[in-house]
């Protein structure tokens, strides 16, 4: 019995560690990276801006398009752990979850029909984060609920003001301030190039369902 409880605790801790790591990266991207950010702005800031204005847009991406960078990170993690003899099941689980963090995120923006019965069931019983929970991240001022795998960590981190505290610390110590998010009401307008990604344009090209089919389809949901 003790062994079973120990394994369960290790499994849960690994899941939450992976979710926290993915949430931490998500926070960094949302708070500080924009399309004009040197080197990574085009690859990280631009897609992030699109996502905050048009959350449903990410659902048209394939698994590889959504996850290639995380897969490379996970591969490096596994290779590093293997090279020093520390490649345990915990590392494998962490790597698999981290590599698929954007896929979990994508499920929260898809309809139940798009997700299918299994994913929808896991969301219904709260083993996976629900769309309703993630919708809080897309509610102005869009500065909370960065973790996207379960419903567990966000209430804890946000109650502790974990992200606010880190932003305050970075501003006070190195002068790094959170960047404005043009998808937040009153902080726009967004960049002109966003027009080509609007839901109206997407429907014209038969790329996305109508707004009524998703809780998070509105640009400022």
What kind of feature is each model-predicted range?
Residues 2-8, 24-40, 51-64, 97-221:
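Cytosolic/stromal cytosol-facing helical appendages immediately following the last transmembrane segment
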Residues 6-14, 82-98:
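Interfacial segments of alpha-helical transmembrane regions
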Residues 13-15, 89-92, 124, 137, ...:
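Short, flexible coil/linker segments at or flanking structured domains
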Residues 42-47:
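Extended non-transmembrane interhelical loops and adjacent amphipathic helices
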Residues 64-82:
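Core segments of transmembrane alpha-helices
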């Amino acid at each position: 019995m003790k062994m079973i409880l120990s394994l369960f605790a290790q499994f849960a801790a690994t899941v939450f560690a992976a979710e926290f790591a993915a949430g931490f990266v998500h926070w960094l991207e949302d708070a500080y990276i924009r399309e004009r950010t040197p080197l990574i702005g085009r690859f990280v800031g631009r897609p992030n801006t699109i996502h905050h204005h048009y959350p449903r847009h990410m659902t048209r991406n394939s698994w590889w398009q959504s996850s290639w960078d995380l897969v490379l990170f996970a591969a490096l993690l596994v290779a590093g752990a293997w090279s020093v003899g520390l490649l345990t099941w915990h590392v494998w689980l962490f790597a698999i979850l981290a590599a698929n963090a954007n896929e979990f995120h994508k499920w929260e923006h898809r309809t139940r029909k798009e997700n299918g019965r299994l994913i929808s069931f896991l969301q219904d019983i709260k083993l996976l984060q629900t769309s309703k929970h993630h919708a809080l991240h897309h509610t102005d001022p869009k500065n909370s609920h960065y973790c996207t795998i379960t419903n567990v960590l966000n209430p804890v981190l946000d109650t502790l003001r974990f992200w606010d505290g880190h932003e305050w610390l970075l501003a006070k110590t190195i002068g790094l301030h959170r960047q404005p998010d043009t998808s937040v009401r009153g902080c726009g307008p967004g960049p002109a190039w966003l027009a080509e990604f609007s839901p109206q344009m997407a429907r014209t090209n038969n790329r996305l369902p109508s707004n009524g089919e998703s809780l998070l389809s509105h640009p400022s949901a």
